[in-house]
Amino acid sequence: MALGVHLAAGEGKRMGQPKALVRDPDGTSWLLRAAAALDQGGCERVVVVLGAGADEAEAMLASVPVDVIVAPNWKAGMSASLRAGLGFLADGDCAVVSLVDLPDVTGEVVRRLIESGTGRDVLARASYDGVAGHPVLLGRHHWPGVLAGATGDRGARDYLATHDHVLVECGDLATGVDVDSLA
């Protein structure tokens, strides 16, 4: 069973607002779109990890079938959010970890990643025209190692750099561009 972990706790200093509260010019919420992508992509359960702007973001998610948690030490960076999200999940063989600041990642990307393989040993990530990106698919057996190496804003990056994993090409579906500024 693949679960979804959506990391949306960032303060968004370069954005000028918490990333969980960012909207496209047409009003589309990045938070809601990303949570929907995990659901539509085949995750059986989705947990959204909040931090900055948590009260407003949680209200936006009130009608969405997701679990919402607030990372207690979200200011420590992505690693704190990842730790909170994976720690919340008691079941499931693997988790698709997605970030709020990837506005063009769709359910099709998530589905393709899940279709590449699931299970407790899976380790895969989306790539865009050969460049590794997000989301990342982490089998449960990898969670302790990922969390042991996660510090500050470095989530699974160091673990993935030292462990064989599958790159799942998704460049035909999205760019995977991480948007840190609206300028």
Kindly label every feature range from the protein language model:
Residues 102, 134-137, 176-177:
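A residue-level structural signature of the nucleotidyltransferase/glycosyltransferase Rossmann-like core
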Residues 13-17, 145-146, 176:
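A short acidic, helix-capping loop that chelates divalent metal ions and anchors anionic groups
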Residues 56-59, 145, 178:
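Phosphate- and divalent-cation-binding pockets in alpha/beta enzyme and binding domains
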Residues 148-183:
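Conserved alpha/beta core of the MobA/IspD/sugar-nucleotide pyrophosphorylase nucleotidyltransferase superfamily
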Residues 1-132, 164-170:
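Nucleotide and nucleotide-moiety/phosphate-recognizing core
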Residues 100, 143-150:
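Short, glycine/charged-rich beta-strand-loop motifs at protein surfaces that mediate ligand recognition
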Residues 109, 134, 142, 152-156, ...:
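Internal, well-ordered alpha-helical segments in soluble enzyme and binding-protein domains
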Residues 131-145, 182:
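Conserved nucleotide-sugar donor-binding
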